[in-house]
Amino acid sequence: MSKDQSYVLKAWEVTVRKTQQAKKRANSVFGTVSVAPHTDNDTTTDDNDDETTTNRSSLEEFYHAERVLPNGDYYTGQWYDSFPHGHGKYLWTDGCMYIGDWYNGKTMGNGKFGWPSGATYEGEFKSGYMDGIGTYTGPSGDAYKGQWVMNLKHGHGVKSFANGDAYDGEWRRGLQEGQGKYQWSDGSYYIGEWKNGTICGKGSFVWTNGNRYDGFWDEGFPRGNGTFKWDNGSFYVGHWSKDPEEMNGTYYPSGNEGNLEWDPKDLFNNLSEYTICSGERVPTLPSQKKLSVWNSSKRIEKPRRTSVDGRVSVGVDRAFEKMNMWGNEIGEGGADMRKELDAELMRLDAEGLQSLKSSPVPMKLPKAGRKQGETISKGHRNYELMLNLQLGIRHSVGRQAPAASLDLKPSAFDPKDKIWRRFPREGTKYTPPHQSTEFKWKDYCPLVFRSLRKLFKVDPADYMLSICGNDALRELSSPGKSGSFFYLTNDDRYMIKTMKKSETKVLLGMLAAYYNHVRAFENSLVIRFFGLHCVKLNGPTQKKVRFVIMGNLFCSKYSVHRRFDLKGSSLGRTTDKPESEIDSNTILKDLDLNFIFRLQKAWYQEFIRQIDKDCEFLEQERIMDYSLLVGIHFREASVAGELIPSGARTPIGESEEESGPRLSRAEVDELLSDPSRWASIRLGTNMPARAERTMRKNDSELQLVGEPTGEFYEVVMIFGIIDILQDYDISKKLEHAYKSIQYDPSSISAVDPRQYSRRFRDFIFKVFTDDN
């Protein structure tokens, strides 16, 4: 596949010479070619709709073609059904060139793209995207070799910069994220965690003179607990920040040397000289190129077709004459443009270090749990189900359809509004070939969920990348109480839950009311649904697996140190794990709660209003057994991992009278009073608050909410209402009747929806209060 640069230049000279001839012959090229239009009958519910579509003409053939196109572009290579298909070479008149594999007019397989500047990409392509393993070499010497997903660096990759710097590590959506090592040209290097292309999290910076810093970082600078070590063995331990008033720590000399006259600010000044190179930008992206094959005035415009692996270029022009082969790079205004995170709002992003004990004092950061879930790789019992799911999602989301409207007709909510599609292994006109077993795919109320994704501001390309990218899904270790299985996308943004038929009926029955509710209340706390689907496996059992795609509430830049599932009932509402097994992933319950949460006044009023509205909606739909899922990130901790109460002082050196910086309560209040800076937070997401510790009385009377102690902690909160698909059916009525004989009826979860709503609100309004 690989061609040297001289070959590219020679080929370009050929096409330039032919360009002038092409302009004279433009009217004759493809003059007799026509293609009948076709439509994708996706709205049918017939299981055999694929078999009824028109097959390609038997007169069409696979042959080698060499053509100068109407605009002067040049193509030579294999040709089939009016498309480049097989191996071929395409040259644009501006100097760009592609040599490689094609499939139905799209780059698919291995290939090489060259720019007139001398820049090249050589590697794998998929459905027109740079996707797989590939190497990009810039004209000035920048080079990246590694994994790509839908035109973005995504996965593991190594990038060398023209100035001599180099990065080896993980990438996500075009930026460094995860674990990685960046080495500067002078030999100094950083190894540790990255976020959104910057040093963020836990890591170490090592200078060539032997000095090093180990600790936490934010936006490329030390922030939080850390240790600076000199090569002679001396070290400085403390809390680091760009704000001098927040800096505090202790110097520990080596041997008998005295105190060092050293200003920690010198470290920040030194680090300012070490910048992360952004690398070269491609002046003309391949996404800006078009193929002139479809640019004939005598051809009938065809609608977009689904690509061979199920993807569709999202956001491209619908006309094939403007069809792009690549999506926009991040940073070019594409859908994957990252919004600036709210780093100024929160002071720390400390990772969980120690286990939170139930002993009175001191409270500690909980033990950090492992990344949740088992990666579904080849050989996993649900590997083929995952492949089927991903193929179906690509088809559903990428399918050509009118622009989603928020004003829907009642017929869109009809439970009978569903689309069946067969996915044979060899592929069809509308589905790609695949290696999984044959299956059928069903979309429930597709127009409604397309509108919901638009309402929730979910970009289709980003949605597909999260669920259908190269990274596999993760299956949670154990099924839920309902027997459902849960799957997480690798970026933690979406959760997929298998559904019982009864739950599917409940969701479809309440879908119209749910849609109107979340549209009317932008800050609704009810869980967000993005799609409802079914996979029918081929075989004698004809097994059906229904599943719903939801937002993952705890997808946040902040580590969730504590998780609570709150219902307002007491029977069985405590964790049955021993304390030694409780970590940051453990979901605690009502009787485990030892905090009252205090929200800033404006947010508290909005919280009260929204809880009332959401509960009224659920009560009207006869839903019960839902809960408020709460996640807490503690913002302040000592070097030893002990939580620092709000207003507490941190010792410096050996003097107990010296005090460290005050916590940022006033700053948070000031920030919240500035509406222009509210964009980074919304109700239930990344909310600053104070958590007041509570203690339950040691007597026989059960206390659902403990007594406040006056001990406050600065926290970041994430919360939302989950499990909203359980109606008060006959099984729940029987459960209530049976348990009422044995226990206090008010302590049981299974109660009438009206009573459940009232009890739930009473409890939540005791746990959440105004921070006055």
Curated annotation (Swiss-Prot):
MORN repeat residue intervals: 75-97, 98-120, 121-143, 144-166, 167-189, 190-212, 213-235, 236-257
GO molecular function ontology, one term from the record: 1-phosphatidylinositol-4-phosphate 5-kinase activity
Annotated S-S bridges: none
PANTHER family: PHOSPHATIDYLINOSITOL 4-PHOSPHATE 5-KINASE 5 (PTHR23086:SF94), PHOSPHATIDYLINOSITOL-4-PHOSPHATE 5-KINASE (PTHR23086)
KW Kinase (keyword) present: yes
The protein's enzyme class: transferase
Key words of the record: ATP-binding, Kinase, Nucleotide-binding, Repeat, Transferase
Lineage: Eukaryota, Viridiplantae, Streptophyta, Embryophyta, Tracheophyta
Region described as Disordered: 22-56, 646-665
InterPro entries to which the protein is assigned, alphabetical: MORN (IPR003409), PIno-4-P-5_kinase_pln (IPR017163), PInositol-4-P-4/5-kinase_C_sf (IPR027483), PInositol-4-P-4/5-kinase_core (IPR002498), PInositol-4-P-5-kinase_N (IPR027484), PInositol-4/5-P-5/4-kinase (IPR023610)
GO process terms (BP): phosphatidylinositol metabolic process; plant-type cell wall modification; pollen germination; pollen tube growth
CDD domains according to UniProt: PIPKc_AtPIP5K_like (cd17302)
Comp. bias (Acidic residues): 43-52
Tree of life domain: Eukaryota
The UniProt record lists the keyword Transmembrane: no
Catalytic activity: a 1,2-diacyl-sn-glycero-3-phospho-(1D-myo-inositol 4-phosphate) + ATP = a 1,2-diacyl-sn-glycero-3-phospho-(1D-myo-inositol-4,5-bisphosphate) + ADP + H(+)
Domain PIPK: start-end pairs: 377-768
Organism annotation: Arabidopsis thaliana
Gene this chain is encoded by: PIP5K5
Any GO CC annotation of this UniProt entry: pollen tube
Location of region: Activation loop: 728-749
Protein name, UniProt field: Phosphatidylinositol 4-phosphate 5-kinase 5
Enzyme Commission number: 2.7.1.68
